UniProtKB/Swiss-Prot annotation:
GO terms for biological process: mRNA processing; regulation of gene expression; rRNA processing; tRNA processing. Its main location: cytoplasm. This is Ribonuclease 3. Its cofactor is Mg(2+). Gene3D superfamilies: 3.30.160.20, Ribonuclease III domain (1.10.1520.10). It is found in: Cytoplasm.
């Protein structure tokens, strides 16, 4: 492809990028960093550019920055969870499927600079390519604006993923609640199924968690296990608030 084509692609990128940063309410100084973050190796190869001008180094940095940011968030949000649980949660957030979800939330793949062949073969929607670009963007944002800007971005795009219970099954709230009760010497914990309704293919279970002889909270779920997890999560929050 010609240099004129390259100029057109870069100009289009810059226009889209500026608009995207306005939408995200993020400041930026070094457009060149972000251009590199969205430059796939196929784009670099098509125009015979420096082989290190693609986004893989920024992807490397962004991965580390994401792990740090998410680690701090989980550390603060779940003060009673042991290291093993936090590690599992972080791995669920900082992984290809989740990063693709985050990128698609804000149509970040529309900014990726691709070579002609990669574009034709569907590279713009390829999960590995999209997740790599997301990490590279975070790396560029960190270099340009610092960790605080990455935190601000994460509050918009990443942390709600946790707040909206997208991590069900990773956090064992029954264990978390049991350990908390044990530390507080509150007594014995039991669970009781109090309702089961709906057709066989779409059952809804309601369970309650009982501390000593008192019902603390209820939870609903598609399985008995899920309803107990929900009840434990609510009970844990209730007790923590009482003891705060």
């Amino acid at each position: 492809m010609t240099n004129q084509k390259k100029k057109e692609m870069v100009q289009t990128f810059q226009n889209k990028f500026e608009k995207k940063m306005q939408e995200l309410n993020l400041d930026f100084n070094r457009v060149d960093l972000y251009q590199q973050a969205f430059s796939h190796s196929s784009f670099i190869n098509d125009f015979n550019m420096n082989r290190l001008d693609h986004n893989e180094r920024l992807e490397f940095l962004g991965d580390a920055v994401l792990e740090l940011t998410v680690s701090r968030y989980l550390f603060d949000k779940y003060p009673e969870l042991p290291e093993g649980n936090l590690t599992k949660m972080r791995a669920t957030i900082v992984c290809e499927p989740s990063l693709v979800i985050f990128a698609n939330k804000i149509q970040l793949n529309d900014l990726i600079l691709l070579g002609k062949g990669e574009e034709k073969t569907g590279g713009r929607t390829r999960p590995s390519l999209v997740s790599d670009a997301f990490e590279a963007f975070v790396g560029a944002l960190y270099l340009d604006q610092g960790l605080e800007a990455v935190w601000q971005f994460s509050e918009q795009i990443i942390f709600p993923y946790v707040e909206d219970d997208e991590l069900d099954g990773v956090v064992d709230f029954k264990t978390q609640f049991q350990e908390y009760v044990h530390r507080q010497n509150k007594g014995d914990v039991t669970y009781r199924l109090i309702n089961e309704e709906g057709p066989a293919h779409h059952r809804l279970f309601t369970s309650e968690v009982i501390l000593e002889e008192d019902a603390v909270a209820e939870g609903k779920g598609k399985t008995k296990k899920e309803s107990e997890q929900k009840a434990a999560e609510r009970a844990y929050k209730i007790l923590k608030n009482k003891n705060a």
